[in-house]
Amino acid sequence: MKKLSFQQIILTLQNYWQDYGCAILQPYDAHVGAGTFHPATVLRCLGTKPWSVAYVQPSRRPGDSRYGMHPNRMQHYYQFQVILKPSPDNIQELYLKSLEYLGIDLKIHDIRFVEDDWESPTLGAAGLGWEVWCNGMEVSQFTYMQQIGGIECRPVAGEITYGLERLALYIQGVDEVRELDWNGQVGEKALKYGEVDFEAEWQFSKYNLELADSEMLLRHFKDSEDQCERLIKANLPMPAYDECLKASHAFNQLNALGVISVTERASYVLRVRHLARICCTKWLEMNK
């Protein structure tokens, strides 16, 4: 198997899905916990208009902060997201062909679809799903998106999320994310993943777990919550959704700090879900 660099894996997936007919979008410029939170998924999976896109999304999960010391868990990582709406009958076959396009021989590697129905409590989103395992390592999530913002997706969209770091660990045959070949160069031009991202990983872990100001984050959450409601009343669901994302990230930061009780956590989840629901509802009203 050819050992593609991290950036070659991204380019290969972009080329594959572009050839299929997907528009290649750019990452969303907001702090999100997963590629699913990009408005190209949350808003565009609603309604009847066909929508086929693919994009890389840098994602942040403050609760996964490990100061860069964990072999494959970070507070900042990358996903490659594909949305096909309506979901084609051969979506599983398309996914498997994308693995072959990456140089993974399906005849000699153990590819398994492990049932794992997906749910995002803060988005009010859910769907039938499977984790995709390659030789015992999870590399992707495969979901039939049935509901977002508490609204049924009609038609159902197919979502494929590649965990780029884990996929690269497998393709390159290394044990730690920091050792991944980033750019495929040799000598002075060679870059490893750790040289690109791990100083930031340590600093943001320090911030997320030790130095973030909980009182400030509580104010930010309430401010974003109020702004979202105000913008919905002004019929502006897209900037309102930005405020929903800000509230969601503030909640994740508070959760990472350990300053929210179990009861409070449930309340915050419901508050973010409400924001997502009103954004999705207003978007659908304006884009039928």
From Swiss-Prot:
Its EC number is 6.1.1.14. This is Glycine--tRNA ligase alpha subunit. It is an enzyme of class 6 (ligase). Belongs to the class-II aminoacyl-tRNA synthetase family. Pfam families: tRNA-synt_2e. Keywords: Aminoacyl-tRNA synthetase, ATP-binding, Cytoplasm, Ligase, Nucleotide-binding, Protein biosynthesis. The keyword Nucleotide-binding applies. Its main location: cytoplasm. One of its GO terms (cellular component) is cytosol. PROSITE patterns: AA_TRNA_LIGASE_II_GLYAB. PANTHER family: GLYCINE--TRNA LIGASE, CHLOROPLASTIC_MITOCHONDRIAL 2 (PTHR30075:SF2), GLYCYL-TRNA SYNTHETASE (PTHR30075). GO terms for molecular function: ATP binding; glycine-tRNA ligase activity. One of its GO terms (biological process) is glycyl-tRNA aminoacylation. It is found in: Cytoplasm. It comes from Rickettsia peacockii (strain Rustic). It catalyses: tRNA(Gly) + glycine + ATP = glycyl-tRNA(Gly) + AMP + diphosphate. HAMAP family: Gly_tRNA_synth_alpha.
